[in-house]
């Protein structure tokens, strides 16, 4: 279990840090569940389970999704729901990448005006 909001004394787990850094969240930010967008995301779900074998490093952004407890339990139990989670998460990742590209373009235009 990876809590997104943490007591200051606790160290972020690697996969939580990867997720938080990519989406530019701070430790105190309210992070909504990527699926239901109703509850606070308290878990970072590995879309491809670490227990499924293959690469031992499953802590890359395409494989990490912020979910509330209910959605996380459902994703763990229901392979079809987990597939929908993968699709939704990849949409969110693509949107974030697009936003970063647009931000960089805007900053370059601003810098060129100087």
Pin down the residues of each PLM region:
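Short Cys/His-centered divalent metal-binding micro-motifs
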Residues: 61-85
